[in-house]
């Protein structure tokens, strides 16, 4: 039987991006050996390195490569070297935002969990974190108050005012809700939709549409929660949640709260998808220029981003689970990079990649 072939645009970027991406390559190599899958991978410049080599943070050659691929595996962009540039020309705003817009990536998926053996890194009490924390935040990324019109400032003195507009169309809510329910089917089959339907008209529509979509997923349990209560419940009893479905602004808040509960940004992957399930996959953390090139960065977020790519864009669930299980095995065995090791011996970035790849091959 011939291997299935997928074309992946690999954009390592700046800072720790290239060294953690090298570990994702090792893991994908291991997946190729274990499964009947082949990845055609091409690396392209993005962010600061693209400014240096091409004069802009997102060269057309990189965009074209992404268009011709099944998915994009993204590292990180930015650093002090480019901070003097006008904001729209800096790596972050000049690369990531245009990519999201070009590919109409309306859905952001942010998994967050406390891995076995790492409970001490969570700021939650041990009796709370010990009950488990394993959540996916499904955030609508292109609508809502960040993009709604009108927005602006006018007037002066005591009458000066500023305004933003929260707008959601039915189709925007329908498509994000479907992804939340489909994600829940791959997990524990629970969706909690976050809104403010006791106050906001946009949230009333949100709740109505989510309930309509839920009828197509009778195997998934739907609940609703107001955003203010949700932020409290995440601290009080995070184990109750599985998939949290959020508007843009509420998802922005909730996903960062979930990240802090885990205790390590170096562990958190992220996916941004469009309607055809084409996706951009990246670590939730930044480019960490202060530790770049030192071989000490935690590559787990980049590796888990590759697992999300396999699950959501390529439909290779077994391979995705192999990566996630290998990460869990390494962490449970106390194989940790410097950000987690404390006073124990730490693995280098490259050693961590080697360990996880080996666990995949041994499974």
Curated annotation (Swiss-Prot):
The gene is leuB. It is an enzyme of class 1 (oxidoreductase). Signal peptide: none annotated. Mg(2+) binds at residues 228, 252, 256. NCBIfam families: leuB. Keywords: Amino-acid biosynthesis, Branched-chain amino acid biosynthesis, Cytoplasm, Leucine biosynthesis, Magnesium, Manganese, Metal-binding, NAD, Oxidoreductase. This is 3-isopropylmalate dehydrogenase. Its main location: cytoplasm. Disulfide bonds: none annotated. It comes from Vibrio vulnificus (strain YJ016). Pathway: Amino-acid biosynthesis; L-leucine biosynthesis; L-leucine from 3-methyl-2-oxobutanoate: step 3/4. InterPro entries: IsoCit/isopropylmalate_DH_CS (IPR019818), IsoPropMal-DH-like_dom (IPR024084), Isopropylmalate_DH (IPR004429).
């Amino acid at each position: 039987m011939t291997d299935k072939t997928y074309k992946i645009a690999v954009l390592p970027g700046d800072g720790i991006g290239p060294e953690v991406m090298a570990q994702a390559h090792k893991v994908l190599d291991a997946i190729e050996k274990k499964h009947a899958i082949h990845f055609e991978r091409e690396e392209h410049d993005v962010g600061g390195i693209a400014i240096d080599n091409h004069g802009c943070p997102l060269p057309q050659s990189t965009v074209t490569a992404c268009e011709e691929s099944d998915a994009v595996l993204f590292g990180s962009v930015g650093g002090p070297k480019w901070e003097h540039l006008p904001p729209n020309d800096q790596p972050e705003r000049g690369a990531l935002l245009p990519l999201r817009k070009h590919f109409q990536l309306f859905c952001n998926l942010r998994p967050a969990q406390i891995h076995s053996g790492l409970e001490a890194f969570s700021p939650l009490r041990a009796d709370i974190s010990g009950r488990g924390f394993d959540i996916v935040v499904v955030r609508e990324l292109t609508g809502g108050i960040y993009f709604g019109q009108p927005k602006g400032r006018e007037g002066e003195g005591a009458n000066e005012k500023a305004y933003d507009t929260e707008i959601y169309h039915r189709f925007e809510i329908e498509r994000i809700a479907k992804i939340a329910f489909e994600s829940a089917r791959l997990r524990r089959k629970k969706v909690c939709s976050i809104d403010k339907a006791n106050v906001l008209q946009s949230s009333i529509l949100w709740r109505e549409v989510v309930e309509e979509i839920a009828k197509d997923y009778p195997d998934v349990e739907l609940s609703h929660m107001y955003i203010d209560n949700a932020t409290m419940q995440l601290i009080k009893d995070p184990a109750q949640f599985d998939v949290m479905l959020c508007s843009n602004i509420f998802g922005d808040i909730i996903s960062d709260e979930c990240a802090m509960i885990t205790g390590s940004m170096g562990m958190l992957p992220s996916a941004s998808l469009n309607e055809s399930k084409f996706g951009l996959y990246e670590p939730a953390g930044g480019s960490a220029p202060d530790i770049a090139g030192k071989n000490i960065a935690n590559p787990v977020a980049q590796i888990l981003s590759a697992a999300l790519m396999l699950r959501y864009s390529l439909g290779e669930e077994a391979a995705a689970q192999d990566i996630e299980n290998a990460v869990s095995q390494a962490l449970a065995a106390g194989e940790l990079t410097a950000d987690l090791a404390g006073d124990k011996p730490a693995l280098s970035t490259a050693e961590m990649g080697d360990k996880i790849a080996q666990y995949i091959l041994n499974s």
